[in-house]
Amino acid sequence: MDISNIDKNLIETLVRQIIEEKISGTKDTVDFVRNKDISGITSIKLPTVKVSESDRLDTGNPSDVVYTKDLFTLEESPRLGCGMMEMKETTFDWTLNYDEIDYVIDGTLDIIIDGRKVSASSGELIFIPKGSKIQFSVPDYARFIYVTYPADWASQN
């Protein structure tokens, strides 16, 4: 086994996380690497966040390729929602009954509103105000973080 490519920082983070869980008596049940202090302050290693079929968003069109994965529960962050979204060659309609900021990690995200397009690529973000009737559109691929207010965006009418 070639261990020369092992990320020492990742191993250190995992070991610290295991020790903290043992000390605090809690188990972090997420499937990505994060450092959660007992104060609630949390860091997440975004490259370790992976989406799967269980994270697929039902847009009403089975050919749409859209995945969302919340990074915090409502108990952990009752006011702000935050998650990872990945899309591939997809455009779908959406109405936001909440405020949202999308920070693009990889690829390009287009937001279409009233026939106009607002785009963001890697390292850029888009703010979408509450009440916007838009289309999320990705011509190729995009991976981005969404931050919503309020946190319980899915139940907003």
UniProtKB/Swiss-Prot annotation:
Keywords, ordered alphabetically: Bacterial microcompartment, Kinase, Transferase
One Gene Ontology term from the biological process aspect of the record: ethanolamine catabolic process
Pfam families (UniProt xref): EutQ
GO MF entry, a single one: acetate kinase activity
Lineage: superkingdom: Bacteria
EC number: 2.7.2.1
InterPro entries the UniProt entry points to: EutQ, RmlC-like_jellyroll, RmlC_Cupin_sf
Claim: Iron-sulfur is one of the keywords in the record: no
Gene Ontology cellular-component annotations: bacterial microcompartment
Subcellular location: Bacterial microcompartment
Catalytic activity: acetate + ATP = acetyl phosphate + ADP
Annotated metabolic or biological route of this protein: Amine and polyamine degradation; ethanolamine degradation
Keyword Oxidoreductase found: no
Main location: other
Family membership noted in the UniProt record: Belongs to the EutQ cupin-like family.
Role: A bidirectional acetate kinase that may drive flux through the ethanolamine (EA) degradation pathway under anoxic conditions found when this bacteria infects the host intestine. It may generate ATP that can be used by other enzymes (EutA and EutT) in the eut pathway. Might serve as an assembly hub for bacterial microcompartment (BMC) shell proteins. Overexpression in E.coli leads to lamellar structures that inhibit cell division. Expression of the eut operon may allow this bacteria to use EA as a carbon, nitrogen and energy source.
Subunit comment: Homodimer. May interact with EutM.
Protein known as: Acetate kinase EutQ
